[in-house]
Amino acid sequence: MDLFGGSLYISGQIRDGGRTNRAGLDPRRQYFAGMDDKEYAFNRENHRIGAGEFEQVSLMFNGSFPMETGGTFYAFGGMNSRDGESGCYYRRAQDNRTLRAWYPDGFLPLISPTLTDTSLALGMKGIMDGAVFNGYAYDFSVTTGSNEFAWGMQNSHNATAGTGPNQQAEFDLGTLGYSQTTVNFDLATQIEVEGFAGPVDLAMGAEMRMENYTIEAGEEAGYADFGYDVLDGPNAGASAAVGCQCLPGLAPANEQDRDRDAFSLYAEMGGNVTEDLLLDVALRTENYSDFGSTTNGKVAMRYQIDEGVAARGSFSTGFRAPALQEAYFSSIATNFIDGVPLEVGTFPVDTEAARALGAQDLEPETSENLSLGMTYKDDKFSLSVDAYMITVEDRISMSETFRGSGTSSNMVDFFAERGVPAAAGRYF
């Protein structure tokens, strides 16, 4: 629509998606020995493996408007909300994790998360008019966005609550949140540089980036140990699994509220040194509130060998600070390892559990990238051939899952001593 001499576009979307299931039939024995009638009658389509069902609502806008002082004001953004449901691994009737008083035939816990995304960008751009940077194209913007992932669980229970008053089937397991705000100011122009065959493109700018990562605990019933043991069956009296089945809730010990600020300056210059040789040079320096400063650059060249034939090459360095999520994410979930269901914890590197497994402070990734190539083009045919080599140091990735020999003869006790209800663990 036309508005204030500019334009505004608004779009929305509603989606309702069903689930898929490629799990097939469960061949395992479900009940204790002597319950063959129930075993034969059991519905073995008890898993859900595939895309989960969801309901989603999205709304986006994009607008630009002329300013009285010259230039253009622009804005864009939107929101997205999505409710989903997907299955965990089925808990059999004979499983120690099953409260048979509630689920005599076993049960399938259902993860029911709610995801909320929001974003908004405001900016203005135009040509500067003044004593400083006269004639430069400018672009000033502020962009903010956030993501919230609220964990929910249905059709589950906490085995340590037994049949007591704290038992329930639906849980609020906690919330993961991330937000980022960036402030950018960019300038661009063409200048004359001695030694170049023509005008040189020049761009420069500054950026301020502010990040926040949070983990909020869920309700107590999702993570607490209420003291009940296995109530019946051949293993009656054994320790019961702690927390909501499939995904124990985030506890106060998991809570995080971490911030990072980064400020950067950058510049890029490119143009024809000769009629056949193009040179491009870029430099960026950045300071992180938690990882110090870094400076990285790029040099790229393209040489026109003959009509339709050119050679090109570039060299650049890179830097990536560990994401806040890599440094501080914490959770416990059921994973199948060699066919055995285990409660696997993912621990921040600064926790006692991660340190005991061998975790060290994360270091920023650094990289070097070298590429060389040739291009050919005529009226009927084009060809590009490139070779590249990328070297990455201090690469950040998930560790192996530690669950036995070399760590402890009893992993449950190993983690319990550190206040973690897990049987295996890993870290970034």
Region spans (language model):
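Hydrophobic, lipid-facing positions within transmembrane beta-strands of outer-membrane proteins
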Residues: G6, E55-F61, T116-L122, S179-F185, ...
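Transmembrane beta-barrel wall of Gram-negative outer-membrane proteins
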Residues: M1-D105, P109-I127
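Outer membrane beta-barrel strand-and-loop segments of large Gram-negative receptors
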Residues: T182-N184, E363, A387-F428
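Transmembrane beta-strands of outer-membrane beta-barrel pores
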Residues: I14-G18, M79-E85, M128, T144-E148, ...
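Outer-membrane beta-barrel signature, preferentially recognizing the C-terminal barrel domain
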Residues: Q56, L115-D117, C246, L250-A262, ...
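Extracellular loop and loop/strand-boundary signature of outer-membrane beta-barrel proteins
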Residues: R44-I49, G106-L110, N166-T175, L250-E255, ...
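Short loop/turn motifs that connect adjacent beta-strands in outer-membrane beta-barrel proteins
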Residues: D2-G6, P66-T72, I127-Y138, Q190-D201, ...
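Outer-membrane beta-barrel transmembrane domain signature of Gram-negative proteins
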Residues: F107-A121, I127-V132, T144, Q154-L278
